Amino acid sequence: MDNKKSSQLWQITCNKSQLKLIAKALENYSRRLGGQFSRYEDIVIRDLAEKRMIAANTEDNFDYQKFSEELQKTLIDLKKLLFPEFPDGSGSYGFDHTPEIGNSYQIYRTIYHELSKENNDNSVYRRPPLPSGTLGPIKVEKIKKDYGKEQ
């Protein structure tokens, strides 16, 4: 990427729900690039599994334990196929497989950090994100003006 293009600034205006969705998508992207494929680390898989389990609650023959074990086994097999370099772990903060991990981490963690400050919660996101990636930090701030009902 040339310096002129990388120094251009862009702005996205969205509501809080949309901001959370962007952060979730980037978190999932970052985790998948780092080889984190488990029912608990992969947000999309976790949400789909929970929906399936809730829907299956009405089925007499649904075996929650069997479903959970089979899902986890399948995800481990998928991870081994896609990430043979991570036999028993994953790449995470500081892993140098691709700068996209650090770049996406920087963005989603900054969003979560700002939401955590706004909610005055005591989560892991209360602290600013560690510097990572090659693109530098982003700026996330709440716009004071109300642009309509937030979803």
Q: Which residues fall in each region the model found?
A:
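Positively charged, low-complexity terminal tracts
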Residues: D2-Q151
